[in-house]
């Protein structure tokens, strides 16, 4: 990966979800989900308090996380598209 997130930013790859009709047709852009599942690819060093103390991120590379739909900025990394989000945008870590 050519990207290294800074501060509390996290690089994720959203899992592709597709809806199909009963006959098997894929409905493009038909997702009505309010959340998405993503895999954490890289994690920044964390945030700093006003006194300069470093607060480490609560997620690690490889974690599966739940993120609100529409969160983050999509960027190209090589041939793939990934998203850069803030740790505060993560709703939950999936077990």
From Swiss-Prot:
Protein localization: Cytoplasm
Keywords: Chaperone, Cytoplasm
GO CC terms, sorted: cytoplasm
Any single GO BP term: chaperone cofactor-dependent protein refolding
Keyword Transit peptide attached: no
Any one Gene Ontology molecular-function term assigned to this protein's record: metal ion binding
PROSITE patterns: CHAPERONINS_CPN10
UniProt-listed PANTHER family: 10 KDA HEAT SHOCK PROTEIN, CO-CHAPERONIN GROES
Quaternary structure, from the entry: Heptamer of 7 subunits arranged in a ring. Interacts with the chaperonin GroEL.
Sequence similarity: Belongs to the GroES chaperonin family.
Biological role stated in the UniProt entry: Together with the chaperonin GroEL, plays an essential role in assisting protein folding. The GroEL-GroES system forms a nano-cage that allows encapsulation of the non-native substrate proteins and provides a physical environment optimized to promote and accelerate protein folding. GroES binds to the apical surface of the GroEL ring, thereby capping the opening of the GroEL channel.
NCBIfam families per the UniProt record, alphabetical: PRK00364.1-4
Identification of the protein by name: Co-chaperonin GroES
Species this chain originates from: Streptococcus thermophilus (strain ATCC BAA-491 / LMD-9)
Gene assigned in the entry: groES
């Amino acid at each position: 990966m050519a990207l290294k997130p800074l501060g509390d930013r996290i690089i994720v790859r959203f899992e592709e979800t597709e809806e199909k009709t009963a006959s098997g047709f894929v409905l493009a852009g038909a997702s009505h989900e309010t959340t998405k599942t993503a895999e954490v690819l890289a994690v920044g060093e964390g945030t700093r308090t006003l006194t300069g103390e470093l607060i480490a991120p609560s997620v690690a590379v490889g974690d599966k996380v739940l993120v609100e739909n529409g969160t983050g900025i999509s960027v190209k990394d090589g041939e793939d598209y990934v998203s850069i989000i803030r740790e505060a945008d993560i709703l939950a870590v999936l077990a």
